[in-house]
Amino acid sequence: MRLSLCLLTILVVCCYEANGQTLAGQVCQALQDVTITFLLNPEEELKRELEEFDAPPEAVEANLKVKRCINKIMYGDRLSMGTSLVFIMLKCDVKVWLQINFPRGRWFSEIN
């Protein structure tokens, strides 16, 4: 798969502890939105989302350049990648919920 490094990088960012107030594995909603937009939605929508973060124009253009390459992949393949990412993000969020609500529970060990 050509995008394996790109997808692995997204997963690392998704499952990395963003700050001291979030638990490791909790996926930021904004990151989820941008990631799915990056894979599946039109370039114009990605540009709007990136501009919400006040990113430098060079960074926005670099992302759009990669997006143009991604858009050359068949939509069905991109949809499969997006589906896989959604399942992984959901698993990360479920782990966090279980850690919070069942800190010593057997459920957490079952999904590791």
From Swiss-Prot:
Modifications made to the protein after synthesis: Linked by three disulfide bonds to C3.
Pfam families: Uteroglobin (PF01099)
Keyword hit for Chaperone: no
Modified residue annotations for Pyrrolidone carboxylic acid: 21
Location of this chain's protein in the cell: Secreted
InterPro entries (alphabetical): Secretoglobin, Secretoglobin_sf
Predominant location: secreted
Record keywords: Disulfide bond, Lipid-binding, Pyrrolidone carboxylic acid, Secreted, Signal, Steroid-binding
Protein name from the UniProt record: Prostatic steroid-binding protein C2
Gene: Psbpc2
